[in-house]
C-alpha cells in the first residue's frame, strides 16, 4: 500500500472566504470550494490553471473560472491560507502585461 500524501489544512483566510461568499453565486462558491480542496489535497496544478506570484515566494493564483481567482499562500507544517478571492482584474500583485 502506497503512503498516503498528507493534506494541507487551511490555517488563515476564513474571513476573506466568508466576506466573498456573502455576495457570490452558488456556482461560484462551488468552483472556489473545489479549488480549495484541490489545494488541500495537492492536485491543484493538475486540475486548475495556476499562476505563480513571482513577487511573493510561496503564493500563487488559482484560476477558478473566467475572471475569478483565488490567491493562496503555502506555509510550513502542511498549512495554507487564502490571501484573495475575486476578479482577475482586481487581484493584488498580479501583473499580466501581455503585448
Report the location of each language-model feature:
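Arg/Lys-rich, positively charged N-terminal/basic patches that mediate binding to nucleic acids
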Residues: 1-37
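Enriched for short, Lys/Arg-rich terminal
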Residues: 2-7, 64-99
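Generic structural motif
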Residues: 10, 52-53, 70
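A broadly tuned preference for mixed-charge, low-complexity surface segments
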Residues: 12, 24, 61-67
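Amphipathic alpha-helical interaction segments
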Residues: 28-29, 41, 68, 92
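A short, surface-exposed loop/turn module that caps and links secondary-structure elements
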Residues: 37-63
Amino acid at each position: 500500500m502506497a503512503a498516503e500524501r498528507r493534506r494541507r489544512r487551511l490555517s488563515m483566510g476564513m474571513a476573506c472566504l466568508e466576506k466573498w461568499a456573502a455576495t457570490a453565486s452558488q456556482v461560484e462558491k462551488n468552483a472556489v470550494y473545489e479549488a480549495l480542496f484541490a489545494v488541500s489535497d495537492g492536485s491543484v496544478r493538475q486540475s486548475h490553471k495556476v499562476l505563480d506570484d513571482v513577487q511573493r515566494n510561496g503564493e500563487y493564483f488559482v484560476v477558478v473560472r473566467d475572471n475569478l481567482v483565488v490567491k493562496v499562500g503555502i506555509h510550513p507544517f502542511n498549512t495554507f491560507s487564502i490571501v484573495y478571492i475575486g476578479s482577475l482584474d482586481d487581484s493584488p500583485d498580479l501583473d499580466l502585461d501581455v503585448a
